[in-house]
Design a protein with these regions (language model features):
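Accessory alpha-helical/coil subdomains and C-terminal extensions
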Residues: 17-32, 147-186
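Short acidic/histidine-rich motifs immediately flanking catalytic phosphotransfer sites
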Residues: 68-74
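Short, ordered loop/turn segments at secondary-structure junctions
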Residues: 1-3, 43, 79-81, 105-108
């Protein structure tokens, strides 16, 4: 998944599907102490193409990363069309204290002002941070951290499309800051 975050537009203006795993490997901003393993699900056409079986398979992959691979944090990169619904499902089905961050992008990677690289970098840094431990699934876009239980897509194309009544924190200048901890029921 995660079509927009890594997609590019060629010289003719046609949108080209990029390899998300290769896109992540090409980023050079990671701290040396963050080890990244990538499980790519390129079979999902776009955010709007995600179906319930895709959500369930993603939950299985995340659970496997946490339980078998001992992941300290997980980042799910996906399209934004059904991000709020998928994030809510991930929170409901996973019930984990391990940081799980959902992110994506509103603009393709080659667009002016593309926010995808910053969203991805912030998501990875946050997932590796102890600050997110016990918060459940969160959505990070445009530096804001939102609980998966309350996030909404408020605009179809604006980079600040996602919001919630009370963002729980933010990632700024690489620092993860949590302002409030949502009450979670298990």
């Amino acid at each position: 998944g995660g079509s927009t975050i890594a997609d590019q537009v060629d010289a003719s203006g046609k949108r080209c599907r990029a390899d998300l795993a290769e896109y992540i490997r090409s980023m050079h901003e990671f701290d040396g102490n963050i080890e990244i393993s990538i499980v790519a699900r390129n079979d999902i056409a776009a955010g709007y193409g995600m179906q319930i079986p895709d959500v369930l398979e993603t939950v299985r992959e995340v659970r496997r990363a946490i339980d078998e691979d001992q992941a300290d944090g997980v980042v799910i990169v996906m399209g934004t069309d059904c991000m709020e619904e998928a994030a809510f499902a991930f929170e409901t089905l996973l019930q984990t204290d391990v940081p799980v961050v959902v992110t994506g992008a509103m603009r393709v990677a080659t667009a002016r002002g593309a926010e995808g690289p910053a969203n991805l970098l912030n998501a990875i840094r946050a997932a590796a941070s102890d600050a997110l431990s016990g918060l459940g699934v969160v959505v990070i876009l445009n530096e804001w951290i939102h609980s998966a239980l309350y996030v909404q897509k408020l605009h179809p194309s604006n980079c600040a499309a996602f919001g919630s009544e009370f963002p729980i924190g933010m990632v700024a200048e690489g620092d993860v800051s949590i302002r409030t901890r949502p009450i979670r029921r298990k």
